[in-house]
Amino acid sequence: FALLGHGLGGDVALDLIRRAPDRVTRVVLMATDPLAEAPQIAAAREARMVAARSGRLAEAMREEIPPSAIADSPWRDEILALVGDMALGLGEGVFLRQSRALQRRPDQQKTMRRVKLPALVISGDADPLVPMRRQEFTANLMPYGKLSVIADCGHLASLEQPEAVGDAIEAFLNGPVMLR
């Protein structure tokens, strides 16, 4: 099967590949950081977790995905509202578990070097949370990795530029499975 993961979902996809490499045929990673979380980012995340535990989940989400994480567009506010509503709908417990998982995520570089299957890394050209240089690094870690940069796009590519993301994924999935 083919896998696609965004952010923490990309970490989950890499873990599945590590555990069952023969079951995965292709992987798409979006806004996925292959490195363990830096101490200063983990500390800032801890402050957001305290806010969420104190009944301020909406505030924590505004800090987790700030307006600057979304490329300037007429629908920026709509995307931020959607993300905030999703977080509130899922609740504090999910936010806390996901935050803790991000804080504890392992360095995935070794796993990525072993990914011997077609891999597509999708990056927004204006993503400040997982910048394009990091995404380029991610693609280059994998022997068959390819980078697709989405223009006028921040951290949430599938919401900001859904057609461009869909086109990139479709071309990748319909492409040959031949490896370099």
Predicted regions and their residues:
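Gly/Ala-rich beta-loop-alpha elbow adjacent to hydrolase catalytic centers
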Residues: 5-9, 13
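Glycosyltransferase donor-binding loop in the core domain
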Residues: 87, 127-130, 154-160
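Short beta-strand/loop motif that positions the catalytic acidic residue
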Residues: 115, 121-123, 127
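Short alpha-helix in the alpha/beta-hydrolase fold that links the catalytic acid
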Residues: 117, 131-140
